[in-house]
Amino acid sequence: MDPNTVSSFQVDCFLWHVRKRVADQKLGDAPFLDRLRRDQKSLRGRGSTLGLNIETATRAGKQIVERILKEESDMPSAPASRYLTDMTIEEMSRDWFMLMPKQKVAGPLCIRMDQAIMDKSIILKANFSVIFDRLETLILLRAFTEEGAIVGEISPLPSLPGHTNEDVKNAIGVLIGGLEWNDNTVRVSKTLQRFAWRSSNENGRPPLTPKQKRKMARTIRSEV
């Protein structure tokens, strides 16, 4: 006898038993009860043909189903991404203006900054999603002065969807270099430090040498 035929019958017997319990608790409608009666007759006929006892087959079917359910529960669930926010909705949606606008496209990201800003303390904040403890998708990054003015921004290009963690790190480096060129002091939020800009110093980034600053600033020379 085909083992699959036997196991199929056993599982059908157990599932019928489950449906019978549902009916016993008055949870089945008329079509449900009608199918239950018809399937009972079918199982009796199959059991007679196969020479199998329905009660014994029901117990075996239960073991099969329980084993499958245990295997399902043991499977690791797919990791879910988390959305992290440094900025409020107001900070994300606020319009801002630049006296000396500069812009650079770095792969799938657009970097904008105001080159007129000098000698300011600036913090970078971002809203983004995280998966496997790494930045997954940048929604928006903005640079704020201590007074709350927006002086820089990194945003995904709608025409080039998709970017990597390295794309974001490179764009942050360009923005920091451009801002530091004008003697601004730039800090990175703790959230960004953890997921997108890991480094050794308290500001969340290794200090740039003057040569590196000049190189970073040159990369952002193209006008808006």
Curated annotation (Swiss-Prot):
PTM annotation: Upon interferon induction, ISGylated via host HERC5; this results in the impairment of NS1 interaction with RNA targets due to its inability to form homodimers and to interact with host EIF2AK2/PKR.
Spans annotated as CPSF4-binding: 174-209
Gene Ontology biological-process entries: symbiont-mediated suppression of host cytoplasmic pattern recognition receptor signaling pathway via inhibition of RIG-I activity; symbiont-mediated suppression of host gene expression; symbiont-mediated suppression of host mRNA processing; symbiont-mediated suppression of host PKR/eIFalpha signaling; symbiont-mediated suppression of host type I interferon-mediated signaling pathway
Assembly and interaction partners: Homodimer. Interacts with host TRIM25 (via coiled coil); this interaction specifically inhibits TRIM25 multimerization and TRIM25-mediated RIGI CARD ubiquitination. Interacts with human EIF2AK2/PKR, CPSF4, IVNS1ABP and PABPN1.
Motif (Nuclear export signal): 131-140
Region RNA-binding and homodimerization, annotated ranges: 1-73
Domain remark in the UniProt entry: The dsRNA-binding region is required for suppression of RNA silencing.
Places the protein is found: Host nucleus; Host cytoplasm
One function term, GO molecular function aspect: protein serine/threonine kinase inhibitor activity
Role summary: Inhibits post-transcriptional processing of cellular pre-mRNA, by binding and inhibiting two cellular proteins that are required for the 3'-end processing of cellular pre-mRNAs: the 30 kDa cleavage and polyadenylation specificity factor/CPSF4 and the poly(A)-binding protein 2/PABPN1. In turn, unprocessed 3' end pre-mRNAs accumulate in the host nucleus and are no longer exported to the cytoplasm. Cellular protein synthesis is thereby shut off very early after virus infection.
UniProt-annotated stretches for the region Disordered: 200-224
One Pfam family this sequence matches: Flu_NS1
Region entry PABPN1-binding, spans: 217-224
This protein's UniProt keywords: Eukaryotic host gene expression shutoff by virus, Host cytoplasm, Host gene expression shutoff by virus, Host mRNA suppression by virus, Host nucleus, Host-virus interaction, Inhibition of host innate immune response by virus, Inhibition of host interferon signaling pathway by virus, Inhibition of host PKR by virus, Inhibition of host pre-mRNA processing by virus, Inhibition of host RIG-I by virus, Inhibition of host RLR pathway by virus, Interferon antiviral system evasion, RNA-binding, Ubl conjugation, Viral immunoevasion
Chain coiled-coil ranges: none
GO cellular component labels: host cell cytoplasm; host cell nucleus
Residue ranges of the motif Nuclear localization signal: 34-38
Protein name listed in UniProt: Non-structural protein 1
Family: Belongs to the influenza A viruses NS1 family.
